[in-house]
Amino acid sequence: MSNETKCPFSHAAGGGTTNRDWWPNQLRLDLLSQHSSKSNPLGGDFNYAKAFKSLDFAAVKKDLAALMTDSQDWWPADFGHYGPLFIRMAWHSAGTYRIGDGRGGAGRGQQRFAPLNSWPDNASLDKARRLLWPIKQKYGQKISWADLMILAGNVALETMGFKTFGFGGGREDTWEPDADVSWGKEKTWLGGDLRYGKGAAGKDEGVVVADEALHGTETSRTDSGRNLENPLAAVQMGLIYVNPEGPDGNPDPLAAAHDIRESFGRMAMDDEETVALIAGGHAFGKTHGAGPADNIGPEPEGADLERQGLGWASTFGTGKGADTITSGLEVTWSNTPTKWGNSYLENLFGHEWELTKSPAGANQWVAKDAAETIPHAYDPAKKLRPTMLTTDLSLRFDPAYEKISRRFLEHPDQLADAFARAWFKLIHRDMGPRARYLGPEVPAEELLWQDPIPAVDHPLVNEQDVAALKQKILASGLPVSQLVQTAWASASTFRGSDKRGGANGARIRLAPQKDWAANEPEQLAKVLKVLEGIQAEFNGAQSGGKKISLADLIVLAGGAGIEQAAQKAGHRVTVPFTPGRMDASQEQTDVQSVGALEPIADGFRNFLKGKYNIRAEDLLIDKAQLLTLTAPEMTVLIGGLRVLNVHTGQDAHGVFTDRPETLSNDFFRNLLDMRTEWKPLSEARDVFEGRDAKTGAKKWTGTRVDLVFGSNSQLRALCEVYASEDGQEKFVRDFVAAWAKVMNLDRFDVA
């Protein structure tokens, strides 16, 4: 009997019930292996920075400028100019950034992939990217999609008469969706029921139209009772920022202002930057709501195969041009929608406004008794009355926003400068330091939000200096644990998401880092005082201007401690050290912005700032992912830091060794010892006690972070490698390599 003819075949690779179906709370170790070389078609040897430097930048800009007015029949340009569409594409690419965890943003070209390519707020941007394809095809790998989408937005502004602040390339494409970014827990588009205590239940249509049956007729919420879950910055699932109709579709400008301030603030924008972005962005283009939402087909990820990745097919009229349905709103703000000017603010303050409905049924506003002065996007003989969104009226009726908006109305030059700077910040916020910027249009001005660090202006230490400094450090009386902990505290602020933080700059000695609970301020101050003394003595004895920065000395001290600990375990190692870090000043440090880097948890130091509804082991994965660590690197660092007695606070949880400050594999050997029985010390199950299975004698205490390395099957398999009889040497070698990686994560100057 043929199995092929008699037995149904319904299980392709990856099909069937998965481990996460059985165990939904399984540890997300997969987050530590995303964006690997196996998903990258360019290979490990491809150097994007080198490729970008060979790009004919002027030619790309010329081609982009020509595209702006080259309207295509398959997707015509509003007002004969694609500029507003490309501004929206660039804005929505960058606008997913949130300062809380640094995730989102334009830096990886993620708008090409799910879920972003199918968010309701990104409707029709699939067409924008297809319009760009001939240019991307022409220049190939010399410019990434991530850079091209942002550059297209810049060129769009320039072709409509606006002078931009500059452009820095260097955004390297990824080839699969980011799995580490939480966009919220809602299961329906436009839902907000889980990110707020009370919010919209959501819906599935790909347009932002209020649905009274779902949203209700909720009254205004203008106080702080509307609390958005951290680190989210968008108010509803599938939106970039806020609902343009108002909170959950409620057309209340003051309630909307609360959402705007919260959302833009979480994207690192203050009130002036927020007003500038809205007023500047809405100087151009229009929204699209020509007909009811039920004319719209599935988003790109849900569309049929023959649609070839395009979504939101419309059966309304021609489905394009004047018949386009995108947001469900039908608003044109400016009298000159393809030319920079102040018409947006002039209209906003020059008319009184009454609530109306778009053809799609969305709440919007129309100027009372106003003349028809707004051009039609496709009929030059037709004029329209000025229209606004609820969120536009927020700029007039919120007292703080109104003050700024009126100043911009009276001083258009101030708006132009503020918008140029805010736009530049928006599209570069996740790129990290200026050292990463590429191309001929990088502005010379240094901006505070870029976390500036002085350029090296003196000769650096050589090998002999390094050896002498190590001796001084080890003779200072500072214990190995404190040397290592201080270096870790300095370097582990790095976030691979937005490339911020790290040891360079030595901001650990400045506010706010010097006062963070994770850094044990009293102990930190003592360590820094000793290291500053060594630094001053060394620098004072040099001729020719040679110096060592405190940033370098902190890292060197950690390495010296590790070398001594390895020697105690019988291994001679040299921890790699590359000088060249510099010390930032307090004036170069935005305290509020840097405050976003403060760890609420650092499993590598067994630190939890408070009690959270997220498991400590999940917070460890989050931290490891931000540090760009693999699962083996995370594992070996935990084992090494524990035996080096690195921990925050007095409780030596996880120090599974009777010879602390010796770089041994004791953590792994003792964790996997079957002669130890573990029991939780409280109902919270956050701290555990390990006792001898025979005698009952207390041996160790450990946290959830410690015990997960023996509990989780994958982590236990990694621990077994290092706990084996032949694992000690590999452990030391791998620990030193992982340590050096963390110490150098922010060294873009030597990468």
Swiss-Prot record:
GO biological process, one term: hydrogen peroxide catabolic process
Reaction equation(s) it catalyzes: H2O2 + AH2 = A + 2 H2O; 2 H2O2 = O2 + 2 H2O
Enzyme class: oxidoreductase
Record-annotated active site: 92
Cofactor(s) named in the record: heme b
Signal sequence bounds: 1-12
Cofactor binding comment, as recorded: Binds 1 heme b (iron(II)-protoporphyrin IX) group per dimer.
Crosslink site: Tryptophyl-tyrosyl-methioninium (Tyr-Met) (with W-91): 241-267
PTM entry text: Formation of the three residue Trp-Tyr-Met cross-link is important for the catalase, but not the peroxidase activity of the enzyme.
Entry's Gene Ontology cellular component terms: cytosol
InterPro entries for the chain: Catalase_peroxidase (IPR000763), Haem_peroxidase (IPR002016), Haem_peroxidase_sf (IPR010255), Peroxidases_AS (IPR019794), Peroxidases_heam-ligand_BS (IPR019793)
Molecular functions (GO terms): catalase activity; heme binding; metal ion binding
Pfam family, one: peroxidase
Protein residues bound to heme b: 282
Matches recorded under Gene3D superfamilies: 1.10.520.10, Peroxidase, domain 2
The entry's keywords: Heme, Hydrogen peroxide, Iron, Metal-binding, Oxidoreductase, Peroxidase, Signal
Transition state stabilizer (site feature) positions: 88
Cross-link (Tryptophyl-tyrosyl-methioninium (Trp-Tyr) (with M-267)): 91-241
EC number: 1.11.1.21
Physiological role: Bifunctional enzyme with both catalase and broad-spectrum peroxidase activity.
Family: Belongs to the peroxidase family. Peroxidase/catalase subfamily.
UniProt cross-references to NCBIfam families, sorted A to Z: cat_per_HPI (TIGR00198), PRK15061.1 (NF011635)
Subunit and partners: Homodimer or homotetramer.
Protein name: Catalase-peroxidase
Species of provenance: Cupriavidus necator (strain ATCC 17699 / DSM 428 / KCTC 22496 / NCIMB 10442 / H16 / Stanier 337) (Ralstonia eutropha)
Top-level taxonomy: Bacteria, Pseudomonadati, Pseudomonadota, Betaproteobacteria, Burkholderiales
Gene: katG
